[in-house]
């Protein structure tokens, strides 16, 4: 009873005791009455007597600490692409007015309590409404993210601007990362040669941007791209100690970084392969290069021979069994350092020919085929022209890479001239045994005489195409490669070669092959049907165009690329020399070398980014101060391209679509689909 009286005396107006206690219920009731007390009202703000200023003060005091500042932050896009942020003073008065209006007389709510007329106090910690949601012109709000909007004046100015070729800033800048790359392939002099000291030799060795080392698990040096044994012996010992330490802990060392150099280690049985690079390549790319060096060793020794050597004597010096093949290892390593699209994409490059012309060559190849033949290849300047193979058998690109390196990079076989009979292990085909390769280069003088004699002996025969011109470049050399499993088939394959050379000379195929090789790779402006970029500043096209591209057909494991001219055949101005005529050709070669490496470094970065382990990217667009680049991956093809830094993403995408459509139209000319099968 006392409790009921006490409850009834409560008038419900006290802010500190606003709850109502339910009355006592008799025990006869099964359940107690569940009366939910109302939520206490929020204290209403008390306005001061000083008008608007007091209202502003109370409004500011009542705001939660999580409120976003009401300062109007906007961005301005400048013509050079940069942006700046600033606060607009014109809207400060508006903000003040809105803040003044935010505090008004209270109004009653549905719950029976009073609350402010506006919802600002209730919702300010939940949402913020910036004043520049839809800015005009170059103004873009930070929240909307419209950073790429351009004014009409800027768009008109852009169409009149000259196209900038890729890497122009790097070519003239003092902080070029490839400074001194032209000396990368210079041999380190012997101790005492030209008065050079051991410290100078060590300095030259450390200045190299890329190193490859091969050593045995016992620490015996086998091969190194730079430096002789006396120079690198101690370093190989350190490398062997580090690798062995991690292997003893059952945690093999795969790679590490020291300064700006990346160390990647690959263990293949009793051999350790080490790559040291300052060229920005990924671990996967460096490891694939080390695998290629391992394949080169297997092509000389075969896997069973290599195992037997180290099973009986783990400390065997492998330099003696590999004697004479150092040039093959060096040329293969140098191709990686210069930048090899074939190694990067794991694909082959084919010579562009008409489908009918390639079919004619394949038919002539098959007609002259010997029973002892396993594979037959015609190669022009490192590009595959024709291949005949057994049904359901094909050569792996890594095996063909070893063959092309032997023929066109090392120069050993070409320097010998005439015909060559080479025992060779193709590891991807069979790493346990040898095949025998007959190699012969077509002599243009010989084929010209054959053409003339055929026309003289057969006056009724229709006139033949003009004979091939003398070879003036390694890219125009044509070689025939006949592979057999029979080591006694040299003369039979030689006879096949003679018949094939005569047949190709009669139908004019040799001239067509040499003409296609001399024509070179397709140019960008021809594919896009645009005007070529001028080398002089200010002469470029306003819309710009691609400078280079790589296109890989995944189904055919082949790729094509555009010509490096003109964007990547010029570099920094020529160095001053006392004899310009003597230094002209070497300077041009150096410029091409550095430009090619700069381009391939960007391609390596693109390839590594889009093929990252946990990446699911299909299209990647990168823009830097030097260049704009694009990578596009589908189940059918891989596409990579490079353009100048001022090229917009829209125009770059349009050009990429045109190139992809062109590649699909020209697929049977660009790639060998199937080849000759017997």
Curated annotation (Swiss-Prot):
Comp. bias intervals (Low complexity): 10-20, 87-105, 450-459
Keywords per UniProt: Autophagy, Endosome, Membrane, Protein transport, Transport, Vacuole
Record-linked Pfam families: Fuz_longin_1 (PF19036), Fuz_longin_2 (PF19037), Fuz_longin_3 (PF19038)
GO BP annotations, alphabetical order: autophagy; protein targeting to vacuole; vesicle-mediated transport
Places the protein is found: Endosome, Multivesicular body membrane; Prevacuolar compartment membrane; Vacuole membrane
Any GO CC annotation of this UniProt entry: fungal-type vacuole membrane
Membrane topology of the entry: Peripheral membrane protein
Signal peptide range in chain numbering: none
Highest taxon listed in the record's lineage: Eukaryota
InterPro entries associated with the record: FUZ/MON1/HPS1_longin_1, FUZ/MON1/HPS1_longin_2, FUZ/MON1/HPS1_longin_3, Mon1
Main subcellular location of this protein, as a coarse class: membrane
Region of interest (Disordered), residue spans: 1-116, 449-474, 568-591
Polar residues bias (residue ranges): 63-77, 106-116
Ranges of compositional bias, category Pro residues: 460-471
Reported function: In complex with CCZ1, is required for multiple vacuole delivery pathways including the cytoplasm to vacuole transport (Cvt), autophagy, pexophagy and endocytosis. The MON1-CCZ1 complex acts at the fusion of vesicles with the vacuole, through its regulation of the SNARE complex during the coordinated priming and docking stages of fusion, and particularly at the stage of tethering/docking.
Family: Belongs to the MON1/SAND family.
Record protein name field: Vacuolar fusion protein mon1
Annotated source species: Neurospora crassa (strain ATCC 24698 / 74-OR23-1A / CBS 708.71 / DSM 1257 / FGSC 987)
Biological classification of the source: Eukaryota, Fungi, Dikarya, Ascomycota, Pezizomycotina
Gene encoding the protein: apg-13
